[in-house]
Each structure stands twice: as C-alpha cells, then as structure tokens.
Regions:
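Divalent-cation-assisted or electrostatically stabilized phosphate/pyrophosphate-binding catalytic cores
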Residues: 108-128
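Histidine-centered active-site/metal-ligand motif
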Residues: 58, 94, 121-122, 152-153
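Histidine/acidic-rich helix-loop-helix segments that form or flank divalent-metal centers
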Residues: 78, 87-88, 135-196
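An amphipathic alpha-helix signature
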Residues: 63, 67, 86, 122-126, ...
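Acidic/His-rich, divalent-metal-binding segments that scaffold phosphate/diphosphate chemistry
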Residues: 1-108
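Accessory DNA-engaging acidic/polar modules
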Residues: 198-257
C-alpha cells in the first residue's frame, strides 16, 4: 500500500476516520507522486526535495512544519483536534496532482516529454478530494480540506502563461497550510530525513549526474574515474545532501577496496 510510505506522518492524525481517509487519499494517488521531484525545474525547492522521491519528501516536510506551527502555545485551545486533523490531510494532499492527473502524466511521459508542474494543480488536487464526497467524511469536512488544498499557493496565484487565478487562503486553517508549504519550499531551510527510511529511495548510481558546477551533469561514476580527488574534496569540505552524500561515500569506499 502506498500509504505505508507515510506511516510516520499518518500517526500524527488523531481521529481514526480522518486517518483512514488520509490512507485512501494516498493509496489512490498517482504513482508519480511518490517518484518525481518537488520542482520540475529545480528552481523553487531545497535540495532534499529534488531528485527521485523529492515530491514525497516535500509533502512530509509540509506536514512536519504544520505540526510544529499548530503545536505552538498561541494556537492552544483555539482549534479542536478534528479541525487540526483536516489540516493534516490537506498537507498530505496539497501536491497530489502536481504534474496533473495520472492520465495526463502518463500520456506525456509515454511520448518521452518532460512533465512539468501544472499551474492549476491546487484546483486539480481540491477536485481530487471532492470526488470522495459521500464516502468517508462529512461533505463539509471534505470542503475544508479541499479549500485548504486549492489555496495553498497563497500570493503566487497567477501565471503569465495561464488565465486561471488561484484562490488565496482565507481561513486560519488555509493560512497555516499555506505557511507550512511556503516554509517547506525555502531553499535555505533544510529538513533531515535521516531517521525516515521510507522518505528516500536512492536513484541508480550508474545514471546519477553530478549536481555541482565543476562536473555538472557528468555521470558521477565517470567523475570518480577521471577526477577522484574531486570526490575526496567534496567528502571533506561540502555538506552534501542525499543522494550525493551516499553515492560519494560509496564511490570512495570502492576506490580504497
């Protein structure tokens, strides 16, 4: 079950029926949601959200930050736990259609096209939630989740390439979900996943390309052969993110064996 990849995050949802619904939402998600990077261009998200599984890690980070925010003393006794749980589902679902519906993604990928972020993905994700009306939760609760999902882009709600204007957050819940997503998207805020074994599936080392300037876009295995001193320098001087950290360590270990 796909939702098993979010077992730690699902544990933070206290209402049994809302947690069960969150599992359904994740299990029904497009396969790409668990595989692609959070940013199709690499411009708008931190290193941990790039590469294979980046969107999944970004989603985990959004919920983690949401839980930090909602746990502050200033919010104590302001909201009931059920309301907070609906926000947790919104965090998990906010980018669940980031590259469009499963059909749209598969059609583009089949033709070998690069699949970019779809601007109206908040609206698609909100509709994804509304499609469960009458099944798991009360309709008004589904609407609370859908509204938080549709407005998660906040002030970045227009595009030069689209005529669509996305809604901005209005309720306190919508504003907190947006804030969590905003903070999880900052390049200078790092999130550690070292204790979350499900958060990172390493890509194939044989096809992984170096992200750093000197050997940018060269196969890392080739760099290990042509410039092994560079890998040693990285190991000693650079605070590398995954998967680069694991790969460099592995290549250096193989060199000494």
């Amino acid at each position: 079950m796909k939702s098993e990849l979010f077992k730690n995050e699902l544990k933070t949802i206290t209402s049994d029926d809302i947690r069960d619904f969150a599992k359904v939402v994740l299990d029904d998600a497009p396969d790409y949601f668990f595989k692609v990077a959070a940013s199709s261009t690499g411009k708008y998200h931190p290193a941990y959200a790039l590469g294979d599984g980046g969107l999944m890690r970004h989603t985990k980070a959004v919920l983690r930050i949401y839980n930090y925010i909602i746990g502050l003393e200033q919010y104590q006794n302001q909201f009931d736990e059920r309301w907070i749980d609906l926000g947790r589902v919104a965090c998990l679902a906010h980018d669940i259609q980031k590259s469009g519906t499963a059909e749209i993604y598969e059609e583009k990928a089949k033709d070998g096209k690069k699949v970019f972020t779809v601007f109206n993905h908040p609206l698609l994700a909100a509709e994804y939630i509304r499609n469960y009306k009458g099944l798991y939760l009360e309709d008004d609760e589904l609407e609370i989740i859908a509204d938080a999902v549709s407005s998660h882009m906040g002030q970045w709600n227009t595009s030069d390439r689209e005529s669509i204007v996305l809604p901005k957050p209005k309720s306190q819940l919508e504003k907190i979900v947006h804030l969590a997503d905003y903070l999880a998207s900052r390049k200078d805020i790092d999130i550690s996943f070292k204790d979350d074994t499900d958060a990172y599936d390493l890509p194939d080392i044989e096809t992984y390309k170096c992200p750093y300037k000197k050997h940018k876009d060269e196969l890392l295995t080739d760099v290990a052969k042509t410039d092994p001193e560079y890998l040693e320098w990285l190991h000693e001087n650079v605070n590398m993110r995954e998967p680069m950290k694991t790969f460099v360590n592995e290549l250096l270990k193989n060199k000494t064996n």
